[in-house]
């Protein structure tokens, strides 16, 4: 068997998430159907580096799969790109060693979150950015977001019901910038892993701080007390993008 690593992007609007699930359309299922056709009807299972939720997009999701023979990498990429649905794009395909695992090999992830702060909002971006129609002070958000960098227990920013016991994660980059051309706020978070709905909960909290309905010091309180009720609301999935995954050599 030959193992392949692929980098893909997808429009999350039409999917119930990346992971295969009954009675709902998923990115995994669509790709596996295409690979099974290419593999002459023999089932192929893919393994993704991350499991994005319903409505969440990806610019650089990584996955791997095995096929019984060597194939030309570009021809395989082209076949997958043209035979999968139009809301999935295969950016690259390459052969990798048999011990490569997209999820378990040590890596870091970068996410972006887009917030449309225009009044009126841009209706063409309603599935691709979360609209926030209330006044915001960027300086307050910048001061608050810097406190998220470093190694912390992010229990207070995690959705209830998660089965993950160790909630300590390291965020190496947390920043926000204003995109004047689109009238968007662009949040960027990089780290060694993120908990269920962690980024959406952090963004919801930061927007509340920017709107002066929560003090900047609330970030430290949430981290210290590990209480989800102290954080802001969960931002919508439509603004979230898995931007890049980087593997250690």
From Swiss-Prot:
The active site is at 53 (nucleophile). Keywords: Isomerase, tRNA processing. It catalyses: uridine(38/39/40) in tRNA = pseudouridine(38/39/40) in tRNA. The keyword Ubl conjugation does not apply. It is an enzyme of class 5 (isomerase). GO terms for biological process: tRNA pseudouridine synthesis. GO terms for molecular function: RNA binding; tRNA pseudouridine(38-40) synthase activity. Substrate binds at residue 111. It holds the Pfam family PseudoU_synth_1. Signal peptide: none annotated. InterPro entries: PsdUridine_synth_cat_dom_sf (IPR020103), PsdUridine_synth_TruA (IPR001406), PsdUridine_synth_TruA_a/b_dom (IPR020097), PsdUridine_synth_TruA_C (IPR020095), TruA/RsuA/RluB/E/F_N (IPR020094). Belongs to the tRNA pseudouridine synthase TruA family. Homodimer. Formation of pseudouridine at positions 38, 39 and 40 in the anticodon stem and loop of transfer RNAs. This is tRNA pseudouridine synthase A. It comes from Streptococcus sanguinis (strain SK36). The lineage of its organism: Bacteria, Bacillati, Bacillota, Bacilli, Lactobacillales.
């Amino acid at each position: 068997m030959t193992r392949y690593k692929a980098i893909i992007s997808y429009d999350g609007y039409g999917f119930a998430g990346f992971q295969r699930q009954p009675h709902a359309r998923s990115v995994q299922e669509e790709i596996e159907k295409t690979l099974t056709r290419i593999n002459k009807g023999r089932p192929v299972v893919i393994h993704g580096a991350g499991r994005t939720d319903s409505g969440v997009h990806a610019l650089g999701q990584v996955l791997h799969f095995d096929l019984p023979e060597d194939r030309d990498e570009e021809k395989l990429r082209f076949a997958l790109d043209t035979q999968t649905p139009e809301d999935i794009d295969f950016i690259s395909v390459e052969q990798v060693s048999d011990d490569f695992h997209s999820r378990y090999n040590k890596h870091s992830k970068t996410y972006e979150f887009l917030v449309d702060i225009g009044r009126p909002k841009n209706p063409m971006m309603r599935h691709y950015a979360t609209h926030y129609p209330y006044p915001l002070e960027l300086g307050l958000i910048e001061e608050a977001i810097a406190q998220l960098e470093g190694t912390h227990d992010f229990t207070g920013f995690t959705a209830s019901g998660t089965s993950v016991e160790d909630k300590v994660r390291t965020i190496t980059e947390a920043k926000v910038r204003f995109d004047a051309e689109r009238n968007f706020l662009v949040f960027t978070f990089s780290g060694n892993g993120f908990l269920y709905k962690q980024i959406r909960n952090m963004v919801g909290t930061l927007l509340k701080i920017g709107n002066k309905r929560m003090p900047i010091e609330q970030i430290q309180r949430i981290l210290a007390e590990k209480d989800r009720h102290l954080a802001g609301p969960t931002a919508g999935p439509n603004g979230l993008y898995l931007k890049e995954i980087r593997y250690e050599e």
